[in-house]
Amino acid sequence: MAHQGDPNISLPFPASPVANNNGAAIASRSPLVDPTIYPGNSRSISSIALHALGLGITLSACTIATIQLALSGYRIWRLTEFIATLSLFHFLEFWTTARYNTANAKVSSYLLTSNGSAYLIAHLAAMIEIIVTSFYFPGLQDRYSNAYTIAFGLALVVMGQAIRSIAMAQAGVSFNHIPAKSKKNDHVLVTEGLYSHFRHPSYFGYFFFAVGTQVVVANKICCVSYLIILWFFFKDRINHEEQDLVKFFGDDYRSYRQRVGTGIPFIP
């Protein structure tokens, strides 16, 4: 049986000889550690842990607050419900990436700050509309919100989140939060599962998830705004992304594009 000092053993880390108490040479193991997992880097374990803790606390606190506020008849339950939904979404973005696309999991995979200022402004606008209508224009909420609209909105949120997360899982290493500009060796054209029904199921899922969040909280202005802005955003993004996908996969992608639609209304 080979032992630690066997020169024929290929170790996953460098071994340097040091002396034991008897003066004999033994192998000292110094693990090769990815420097990006240290604090301040893109895969910082400490930062990942803090993000998960923060999202978990926020999700738990806001879920409890939503239930208590709703049962007590306070309209502001919509604000805590919206924040709870966002907390779960951002956690699942990282978790799904870490589980099915491990090599590409980074702190930025939470998408908390990497989606740009427009993304943050959209959420801030939704929160402001909730606060303003809850305290100053409650009649608007009563006009557009009831048990049926809330249930419909929640159905859109759950469906959208499920489709997006499953799409990320099925794409595996071929999924990127930022569209790839060059083809990697492990990048393959995924056409099975959800991808046999939608060309971009993660976009389809997020489109209806985002609109659903506004239906739940009865945000009339943001609901219409989200619908319009996201439609133009995904139309433009899909157009540019597919130009690169045609370069990567040629006729295979052209054929796939002819067979399968996006599922997003009026985006073929």
Regions found by a protein language model. Give the residues of each.
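Membrane-anchoring alpha-helices and their flanking helix-loop junctions
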Residues: A2-N185, A210-P268
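Active-site-proximal inter-transmembrane loops
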Residues: I178-Y206
